[in-house]
Amino acid sequence: MATQADDAAASQANIEDGDLKEHVHDELDKIQQQRSTATVFPEPLRESDSEDSDDEDNGPAQAPPMFMNMNQSIYGLIAQASNRVDFNDRFDGMSSDEEGESSQNTRTESIARTSILQPAGKGKDKVHRRRKLSEHKLLRSLPALPKLRSRHKSQHSTLPAPEEVADEADDEHGDGGLLPAPALTLTRQDTQDRLAPVMSRMLEAKADLSIRPSFDLDRLSSDVSRSSDSDEVSALSRKLKEIFEFDEYEQVIEEYPCWLLQSVLLQGYMYITSKHICFYAYLPKKTHEAVKSGYLSKSGKRNPSYARFWFRLKGDVLTYYKTATDVYFPHGQIDLRYGISASIVDTDKEALHFVVETRHRTYKFKADSAPSAKEWVKSLQRVIFRSHNDGDSVKISLPIKNVMDIEDTQMISFADTCKIRVIDNDETYAIDEYFFSFFSFGKEAINVLKILIEDSSGARSAEQVITGDDHDSSQPSSGHASKAASKRAPSKLSTGKLPDTVKATLAPMSPLSPRSPSQLSPRASMDAPRSSFDGFRRFGKKSLDVTSSIGDHSPRRSFSGRRSTSHQHRQGTTTPKQAHDSEDSFLQSSIENPSISTLSPSSYDEPSASQILQGSDVFHSPMMRRSASTSRKRDRSGKRTPRSSSAHGDRHHGIPHAATTGAIHKMGDEQADSQRPATPTLNSITKIGAYPLQRANAFAEYLSRTSQRMGSMFATESLGYVEKVHGMWKGEHRHYDEPQELRTDDDGEDIDSEADDKMQTTIDRFRAHFALPESEKLVATYFGAIFKVLPLYGKFYISDRSFCFRSLYPGTRTKLILPLKDIENVHKEKGFRYGYYGLTVVIRGHEELFFEFRKPGLRDDCAVTLHQLMETNRFLEQSGILDQEEQDDEEAAAAMAERDELQEARQDEFVDHELTLPRTTSGVSNAPTILFDNPNSSGLAFKPQKSMKITCLTIGSRGDIQPYIALCKGLLAEGHKPRIATHGEFQEWVESHGIEFARVEGDPGELMRLCIENGTFTWAFLREANSTFRGWLDDLLDSAYTACEGSELLIESPSAMAGIHIAEKLEIPYFRAFTMPWTRTRAYPHAFIMPEHKMGGAFNYMTYVMFDNIFWKATAYQVNRWRNKTLGLPSTSLEKMQPNKVPFLYNFSPSVVAPPLDFSDWIRVTGYWFLNEGGGDWKPPQELQDFIAKARADGKKIVYVGFGSIIVKDPAKMTQEVIDAVLKADVRCILSKGWSDRISPKDDPSKPPPDEPVIPAEIHVITSAPHDWLFSQIDAAAHHGGSGTTGASLRAGIPTIIRPFFGDQFFFSTRVEDLGVGVCVRKWGTNSFGRALWEVTRNERMIVKARVLGEQIRSESGVDNAIQCIYRDLEYAKSLIKRRAGKNNAEHGLAEDDDDTEESWTFVGRDEPDPDAVTKKLSDGLAGLGAAGDRPPPLGSQAPTVA
């Protein structure tokens, strides 16, 4: 044995002097040699000799340790102590790592030696053991003291250095059978001063003895640190020190790609250094994007039946809705920050059912298929895993001295897995288990870890760590010993000190998803399960937001990077101040044995009596205050000063929380607090006598405070309830954004604190109601009603980022969560009910919402608050100031940069370790969910292999033709052969761009006159068109078919009416494209049926149903006749054509007309198709350039006024009104008089035209000019509101005035007003037009909005997007035309009601009639369109009345 000990000591010395990395590689080589030359012993020789050795080596000591001067009084010790002695510093024992740093030149002498008898035969054995602390009578007589903390190396005491414990016993005492006790030594300089009392020196020796793990182990860490300072530090070592916040540079021994195995499999890298085992993985959070969405069935809380909802997994919240379009009205929410697990139900053979367990309840779901259920479970597991991690990267740092053992486990069949059991810290001695899987280098990595643990100076068995038993420290720790030690009673906790704690951003969890609450214990600690771990651990900014009395008390340690510190202390996260919030240490009574029940007081959902009374000072353990100045105080902003990890650990009656996976704090005062020793000093022990007086004072204070609270409670409890109900029905409001920093009255601190507590309660309830993050700041609350079918009374919440509503009627659960960024505008209108005041909120891509208030002041205050917050958010976005989402993006970018730097440093040092992905997991049904960096996925190529002959069919004015010219030029660039089929007057313009032209009959001017005079598709329009336009429609259909022959793809404006039939005849794919909404939606009304006021989603949807039926019924007879005679196709109907399933391309910007949420996947909003004609050969006239230059020199605003080729009754009058308005508004005008070029047929052509007004010098008249050039030279534009002209002015970033005449012009004028970038002039006149000119040229708010919108539109590429959409939906369009061709080739004897392919529409909402019923009624009631009757007013000027 002695020879073995000598060899071990020599080997350890060689490790210290040499390189640790080389030693590990040498040990690996020995293992390989042993494997190759291993001797197989026969069966009788395989038994262990452990029993004999135990009987021989581990005999009991002959005598217990002896102490001197046991009769000395403690008060005598105090009297003998010098005033200059600081007992706090004197009893702060140094760690074993510090002993080697003392000066070697200082002579020391032995003060006292205590001999310990040893059994015979052990005299020459140099392997010494620690004595059992339970045998020391002095320590057994003292209370259960907290563990001793080591002081940081940088802290130097002003007193002489304390006595050091000798590392090795003197050899001359070996023969006598006595083992020399640790020698208490002092320097010669110290002996000149007065010595400390004997008991003081003895207690110091005991403290140092408890710190040292073993006397025969050398100080590897200190040697490494000294060598690392002298040698050159590698880039990887520097980066690891920065990321994991080491105290010093550490030598990197090995690096391996590995996977952290928990409920998911996380890709990362393991870094093995001289002192730590580190794991790093880049895991970005996806807070602002929807991860998965789809339909699921959910079981109710009390109703076991399943109901079908549409689910969306976004951020940390799983939200479900009644329909996929009501994304602002959630039916329910599941906050996955409280999530524990997600798993498939084992008893389900079909694997359709799965459950999600949270701290509150268990949710049951049913998917449509087994793959869908599996995908949902994996997505939920990923989100739960991410939500439990702090930051955008996973960091785990395991000190090697804390590692108990490393065990090979077979968790998954396709990788090597090891289990690392590590002691969390020296406060609770909780044992964590971490599982790491290796798909490559697995055996090598596990061997390196085992070698490093066995050779480390901190290698101790679990029994030594927990109980301090006297076992041979040279024995390697085994799994059997660890398991036996873990079952030890916690009453044997020693005062030993671990040099470091486990630090992690992620909690250690079981590698298997728990199936029941009894299996939720992630680690085995002592002898009791720790089932409360997952539910109550604190995880930083995305952590479990448990009650303040539980979640905030956990001394969990996390990496103190920029992410964790920036989100832990936000506004509104404070808790009521308690006495134990200060930096006071607590001393347990000697009769109180620590147990697991006290370590985890939050293990149960129902609070115990001690938890209820935790706010009382009476029920706390005795408190030892360092000084009055160290107490923490609450600052005026409602935040608390950051506390050190020890302060966190001392909460809950001095017992730290069970979950204590350690934290890293920045160096400074916080570290000084955390490094203070937990072992009570002699100075502190003297204060024990004052505890009864402190308890009495605290009890008296408690009685006084409680009596006052109870008295006020009885007096105000019932009154407060009445006031709440009265305030709710009275409809009051409250603002919560008053800065607390303005309060300067210190006398009112208690009043302010009480008000702040009430305010904080309201804010917490607001966040809990809507599952919002802690960063959401409540601004104001109101009471009012949301108006859907019936008014629903409730409470409005306005935060800095959301507008929320919650119904208060019993039996209702309506909620609204509307992000402020989705609100386009807010309008004040009349209420639907008498005596109420309305507020309309216009939402991007959604129908407008209506609200009502009892008082106009409340309505106005709510509108102003919303406008202010909307403007603030827009200003922050424009100015570049980071909002919350951008802050998260910046943190994610920082984490990505950190990952890249670490990868670069890793590749420089370990180039042979490349990551090997588990390629066989796809075939394993129960393989864990895999998380890894998202690679850059390349998109699929949808472009056809050969060029196509594409025809664009359209009719209308110049603005209707121009977008198709732009699209055809893009198709030409793609190699296709485009053709435009339209009116003959545009032939020269089309061919000038190199595009083939095909003629379509029809006069666009005649059609425009019909629309202006009768309104767009009104009863008068249909009656006149039915009588006079029969021949016009026949010519249009025949010429359109001729123009489209030979085409391989047809793109048509739906106003041409012939395209869908031609595509059916030619059996070619068919697309629709238009400049205004033509597809059924609740977001916008039909562009041809625009009301004067907002009418809601039900009305909007019904306008499309009405128009489709009227439009088809008016043309059905001629169309079916043309199909039969010309095309040879059978007659059709609106239901058989299914026009709403045709792929659609909208050529307007999504920034102007946001895609509605209820659009199908084949409906695309591509962006404007601009035809840039100003950048070619066109040159502006010199007169125009001079006019613009003179206006700029005079400091005048320049506006453009042009209403295109609109036909007006009195062109001269309109010109004079424009002149007068320009002069009144004091602006310069560029006038394009296109309205005088066309003459109304009602006027006599033989009459001479009226005299034109005299044009003043402030106005310059032009014939035409490219919009892309002209609009960039002016300040505002006024036009008729066509799609192309509106897009041109908005792209230039200038405010727009729209004077609508017919068609889609009313729609775009409404959109311009809703966006706040222009003015709509519905009632024309000199004064109204002049006021509009004044506003658009001087309203800075409107000017800024227009400029921002212009930047967004200019960044789009509408033509390129449209071409890609054509490629993407081409196969879908072919499938539709094949289906129609198959039906036409079938026998004509099919039943008329054959609905195999009939379109099935889900009508969104419950507040509108069935569209199918309306379609049939309209079809039956429109038989006599040509009947005589009074002509109704145009629908473009007023809202129609719908029965």
Curated annotation (Swiss-Prot):
<dbReference type="Pfam" id="PF02893">
    <property type="entry name" value="GRAM"/>
</dbReference>
<feature type="binding site">
    <location>
        <position position="957"/>
    </location>
    <ligand>
        <name>UDP-alpha-D-glucose</name>
    </ligand>
</feature>
<feature type="domain" description="PH">
    <location>
        <begin position="289"/>
        <end position="385"/>
    </location>
</feature>
<keyword id="KW-0328">Glycosyltransferase</keyword>
<feature type="compositionally biased region" description="Basic and acidic residues">
    <location>
        <begin position="18"/>
        <end position="32"/>
    </location>
</feature>
<feature type="compositionally biased region" description="Basic residues">
    <location>
        <begin position="125"/>
        <end position="134"/>
    </location>
</feature>
<feature type="compositionally biased region" description="Acidic residues">
    <location>
        <begin position="164"/>
        <end position="173"/>
    </location>
</feature>
<feature type="region of interest" description="Disordered">
    <location>
        <begin position="1"/>
        <end position="69"/>
    </location>
</feature>
<feature type="compositionally biased region" description="Basic residues">
    <location>
        <begin position="631"/>
        <end position="642"/>
    </location>
</feature>
<feature type="binding site">
    <location>
        <position position="1280"/>
    </location>
    <ligand>
        <name>UDP-alpha-D-glucose</name>
    </ligand>
</feature>
<feature type="coiled-coil region">
    <location>
        <begin position="883"/>
        <end position="910"/>
    </location>
</feature>
<comment type="function">
    <text>Sterol glycosyltransferase responsible for the glycosylation of ergosterol to form ergosterol-glucoside.</text>
</comment>
<comment type="similarity">
    <text>Belongs to the glycosyltransferase 28 family.</text>
</comment>
<protein>
    <recommendedName>
        <fullName>Sterol 3-beta-glucosyltransferase ATG26</fullName>
        <ecNumber>2.4.1.-</ecNumber>
        <ecNumber>2.4.1.173</ecNumber>
    </recommendedName>
</protein>
<dbReference type="GO" id="GO:0005975">
    <property type="term" value="P:carbohydrate metabolic process"/>
</dbReference>
<dbReference type="InterPro" id="IPR050426">
    <property type="entry name" value="Glycosyltransferase_28"/>
</dbReference>
<dbReference type="InterPro" id="IPR002213">
    <property type="entry name" value="UDP_glucos_trans"/>
</dbReference>
<keyword id="KW-0677">Repeat</keyword>
<feature type="binding site">
    <location>
        <position position="1283"/>
    </location>
    <ligand>
        <name>UDP-alpha-D-glucose</name>
    </ligand>
</feature>
<dbReference type="GO" id="GO:0030259">
    <property type="term" value="P:lipid glycosylation"/>
</dbReference>
<feature type="binding site">
    <location>
        <position position="1265"/>
    </location>
    <ligand>
        <name>UDP-alpha-D-glucose</name>
    </ligand>
</feature>
<keyword id="KW-0813">Transport</keyword>
<feature type="binding site">
    <location>
        <position position="960"/>
    </location>
    <ligand>
        <name>UDP-alpha-D-glucose</name>
    </ligand>
</feature>
<dbReference type="InterPro" id="IPR001849">
    <property type="entry name" value="PH_domain"/>
</dbReference>
<feature type="compositionally biased region" description="Polar residues">
    <location>
        <begin position="585"/>
        <end position="614"/>
    </location>
</feature>
<dbReference type="GO" id="GO:0034045">
    <property type="term" value="C:phagophore assembly site membrane"/>
</dbReference>
<feature type="binding site">
    <location>
        <position position="1285"/>
    </location>
    <ligand>
        <name>UDP-alpha-D-glucose</name>
    </ligand>
</feature>
<keyword id="KW-0072">Autophagy</keyword>
<feature type="binding site">
    <location>
        <position position="1305"/>
    </location>
    <ligand>
        <name>UDP-alpha-D-glucose</name>
    </ligand>
</feature>
<feature type="compositionally biased region" description="Basic and acidic residues">
    <location>
        <begin position="1405"/>
        <end position="1419"/>
    </location>
</feature>
<feature type="compositionally biased region" description="Low complexity">
    <location>
        <begin position="506"/>
        <end position="525"/>
    </location>
</feature>
<feature type="compositionally biased region" description="Low complexity">
    <location>
        <begin position="1"/>
        <end position="13"/>
    </location>
</feature>
<dbReference type="GO" id="GO:0016906">
    <property type="term" value="F:sterol 3-beta-glucosyltransferase activity"/>
</dbReference>
<keyword id="KW-0472">Membrane</keyword>
<feature type="region of interest" description="Disordered">
    <location>
        <begin position="463"/>
        <end position="657"/>
    </location>
</feature>
<dbReference type="InterPro" id="IPR004276">
    <property type="entry name" value="GlycoTrans_28_N"/>
</dbReference>
<dbReference type="InterPro" id="IPR011993">
    <property type="entry name" value="PH-like_dom_sf"/>
</dbReference>
<feature type="compositionally biased region" description="Polar residues">
    <location>
        <begin position="104"/>
        <end position="117"/>
    </location>
</feature>
<dbReference type="Pfam" id="PF00169">
    <property type="entry name" value="PH"/>
</dbReference>
<dbReference type="InterPro" id="IPR010610">
    <property type="entry name" value="EryCIII-like_C"/>
</dbReference>
<dbReference type="Pfam" id="PF06722">
    <property type="entry name" value="EryCIII-like_C"/>
</dbReference>
<feature type="domain" description="GRAM 2">
    <location>
        <begin position="765"/>
        <end position="870"/>
    </location>
</feature>
